[in-house]
Each structure stands twice: as structure tokens, then as C-alpha cells.
Design a protein with these regions (language model features):
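Active-site segments that bind and position negatively charged phosphate/pyrophosphate groups
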Residues: 58-60, 81
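Extreme N-terminal basic, low-complexity initiation segments
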Residues: 2-7
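Short, solvent-exposed cationic patches
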Residues: 91-111
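Hydrophobic "anchor" residues
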Residues: 74-75
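Short beta-strand scaffold segments in enzyme catalytic cores
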Residues: 60-70
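C-terminal binding/interaction regions
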Residues: 9-11, 15-55, 104-164
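Compact, glycine-rich, soluble single-domain proteins
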Residues: 79-93
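Short amphipathic alpha-helical face segments that pack within enzyme cores
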Residues: 90, 94, 125-128
């Protein structure tokens, strides 16, 4: 671990300096829960693939990055691909399709990092895909709304009445 601005950072092996969420508030890494450790891993994974760039005059990619924790414990990442038509894809759906490509379909946690570096909620299309993917249990998927303040909601709270 490294010291920077009073916080320890891990994930250096992945090329990303990520402040440990729990240590920012308590000053202690040893008291970090499994849940906090998972969110830190998701943040580091998303940050590692975030690389906003122009691919062509019609396509930009990587401004938003997402990481999904599958129920198995594996993490899947994706980046947004924006096009000048409707052919683009959000980072969250890209990560979900990566998960499906690798034989999994059950989501536990979702974290997306926006171009400004903050985390935020998935858009309606991404929420809809998660609901359709897990119609019996989507309500329990955890979404990191604000990594800095540790604000987390479930997809059920964000999408309380699907297809009334």
C-alpha cells in the first residue's frame, strides 16, 4: 500500500490508486467489512478500464466505466461506447453483456464511474436490463450511487414498480 494525502491506497498492481472506502472514514483498514472491500474492488476495476477517448469522428468510448460483482464473486467491467446514432451502449450494459458472455447472469452489486470521476445510478435502459435479467430477485441488486459518501441503494428502491 502507498500513502497519499493521508490515505492508504491499494490496487497499485492494477495501475490504479484507489482510496479504501472504509479507511477514509475510520482510519483503519483492519476493520473493513467484506462489503466495503467488495465496493473498493469494484471501484478499482471500473477505474482501471475508464479511459475516455475519441475512436473516430462518430464514436467515443470509455468516458463512463462500470464494474459488476456477480453472485459468484467475479467482477466484470465495461465502458460506454457513444455513437452518433442509436448503436452505442452504456458501460453498465456492456459489463452485464461481458458477464453473460462469460456464462453468468446473477448480479450482486453495480458501480459506475462517470466522466467527472463521481459514481452514479444506471440509466433507465440499464435498470430495465437488470430487471429483465433477474425478474425474481432484481430488488436486491445493490447500486453504488456515491462512492465518496458510501450512498448505496438497491435496484428495488430505484425501480420500485416495474411494469405495473
Amino acid at each position: 500500500m502507498q500513502e497519499k494525502a493521508g490515505f492508504r491506497y491499494q490496487w497499485k498492481s492494477e495501475g490504479v490508486d484507489v482510496p479504501l472506502m472504509h479507511e477514509k472514514r475510520t482510519g483503519h483498514v483492519s476493520s473493513m467489512t467484506k462489503d466495503q472491500w467488495q465496493w473498493d474492488r469494484l471501484y478499482a476495476a471500473a477505474k482501471a478500464v475508464q479511459n475516455g477517448r475519441k475512436i473516430s469522428e462518430y464514436v467515443e468510448a470509455g468516458g463512463v466505466a462500470a464494474a459488476i460483482l456477480a453472485v459468484s464473486g467475479r467482477i466484470y467491467t465495461g465502458v460506454c461506447v457513444d455513437t452518433c446514432s442509436t448503436l452505442g451502449i452504456c458501460a453498465e450494459r456492456n459489463a452485464i453483456f461481458n458477464m453473460i458472455t462469460n456464462g453468468e447472469q446473477d448480479i450482486q452489486k453495480v458501480l459506475a464511474i462517470m466522466p467527472n470521476g463521481k459514481t452514479g445510478a444506471p440509466c433507465g435502459a440499464c435498470r430495465e436490463l437488470m430487471v429483465q435479467l433477474m425478474p425474481e430477485s432484481y430488488q436486491h441488486i445493490e447500486i453504488m450511487l456515491d462512492y465518496k459518501t458510501e450512498r448505496i441503494m438497491t435496484l428495488g428502491e430505484l425501480t420500485p414498480e416495474w411494469w405495473i
